[in-house]
UniProtKB/Swiss-Prot annotation:
This is O-methyltransferase atr3. It catalyses: 4-O-demethylbarbatate + S-adenosyl-L-methionine = proatranorin I + S-adenosyl-L-homocysteine. It comes from the Eukaryota. It comes from Stereocaulon alpinum. S-adenosyl-L-methionine binds at D190, L191, D217, I218. GO terms for molecular function: methyltransferase activity. Residues 1-22, 52-88 are annotated as: Disordered. PANTHER family: METHYLTRANSFERASE AUSD. O-methyltransferase; part of the gene cluster that mediates the biosynthesis of atranorin, a depside of polyketide origin that accumulates in the cortical or medullary layers of lichen thalli. Atr3 methylates the carboxyl group of 4-O-demethylbarbatic acid to yield proatranorin I. Atr3 is also able to methylate the atr2 product proatranorin III to produce the final compound atranorin. The first step in the pathway is performed by the non-reducing polyketide synthase atr1 that produces 4-O-demethylbarbatic acid composed of two 3-methylorsellinic acid (3MOA) moieties. Keywords: Methyltransferase, S-adenosyl-L-methionine, Transferase. Homodimer.
Length: 346
């Protein structure tokens, strides 16, 4: 494939394969996803397309093998709503998000609150993340970056590509599209395919959004779905994602992310996560316990120094610690902040 700046927008051809990799009858051949390019894979790779289709099974190898964040609650109490991060209703809905739901999704103003509550209840049954319980998916994050206007320009005017990794409902994808980014150049992936399917319910765009979504496990090296995009992305977005890992696993995740990017200066990793005034390892204050790393700016810079040493590349980190909704709650550790970042390949 030639430069993405000169190629036509990627298209997805659906076909029926009852026994495909994901166990679903609706998939897209990666050779059509990125025309004329199969990334050197010997096996045929198929990326399940959730555009207007049913939800797909989760791709995971289990927390013992991958180091993915452990369950937040015992399986027998998975639907427990007596935890401090479960809110019965949103205290308020961010005006930007409300505008997206009313103008992009055409949901009447007086129906927005009940609509998001209904979607949240379904999502809670999938996996009770704090961001689900607190309705934090209603707080768009990608547009908080000072780089956001330039990002929209790259996608809209330069025909560049973006992968939202750990996209949940892909709410930030919808923000990009509403601001003029071509939806066919944007991809989304999450451990839970159900979340991406609920995104279509939340935004009511199943028949119009041309983005491609697929379930994936970033730490599963055998995941051919993700390998199908290696070397093809101009930007990878990590929204509320990296705080799920300890320091060593974070280095491993970021190293894997670099393989998704085009190997050239200007390729970009950007995102937001739970951070801390002092980067350290602490037990996370949830019933399952666990030891995860809370980054400050210096520790995030160390991650990318190690990534650079492992890959023979150089990266520039721009980051900031901020207060934000859902950060600094009473049940969280002292010093919790929102950590936003952009990491540029030099």
């Amino acid at each position: 494939m030639t430069s993405v700046d000169t190629m036509p927008p990627p298209m997805v051809r659906l076909e029926s394969q009852p026994d495909d990799l994901m166990g679903s009858s609706d998939v897209a051949d990666v050779s059509d996803l990125l025309p004329g390019h199969t990334n050197g894979l010997e096996d045929e790779v198929k990326i399940p397309a959730t555009n207007g289709l049913k939800s797909h099974p989760v791709v995971t190898t289990g927390t013992e093998k991958t180091g993915v964040m452990p369950p937040l609650q015992p399986e027998s109490k998975k639907n427990n709503k007596g935890v401090p991060w479960y809110h019965a209703s949103p205290n308020d809905i961010d005006p930007v998000t409300r505008g997206l739901l009313e103008n992009y999704s055409k949901i009447p103003s007086d129906q927005v609150q009940q609509h998001v509550i209904a979607i949240r209840e379904k999502a809670w049954d999938v996996y009770p993340y704090p961001c689900i319980g607190q309705f934090l998916f209603l707080n768009l994050t990608i547009n908080l970056s000072p780089y956001y206007p330039s990002l929209v320009s790259r996608l809209r005017d330069q025909n560049q590509t973006l992968l939202d990794l750990g996209c949940c409902f892909a709410q930030d994808v919808r923000k990009l599209v509403s601001d003029g980014a071509p939806s066919q150049n944007i991809y989304g992936a999450d451990l839970y395919g159900e979340f991406m399917d609920l995104g279509f319910e939340l935004f009511r765009d199943r028949k119009t959004l041309k983005s491609t979504f697929f379930p994936t496990d970033i730490l599963n090296e055998r995941d051919l779905l993700l390998k199908g995009l290696d070397g093809e992305m101009d930007v990878v977005y990590l929204g509320l994602f990296l705080h799920h890992f300890d320091f060593e696993t974070c280095v491993k995740v970021c190293t894997r992310v670099t393989r998704l990017l085009k190997p050239k200066p200007g390729s970009l990793v950007m995102g937001v996560q739970v951070g801390s005034l002092v980067g350290d390892t602490k037990p996370i204050p949830i019933p399952s316990g666990g030891i995860l790393w809370r980054h400050d700016i210096a520790s995030l810079e160390r991650v990318w120094e190690e990534v650079g040493a492992l890959t023979g590349t150089k990266w520039k980190v721009e980051a900031r610690l901020e207060r934000g909704k859902g950060f600094g709650e009473k049940w969280q550790l002292e010093g919790t902040r929102r950590l936003g970042f952009e990491v540029y390949r030099l």
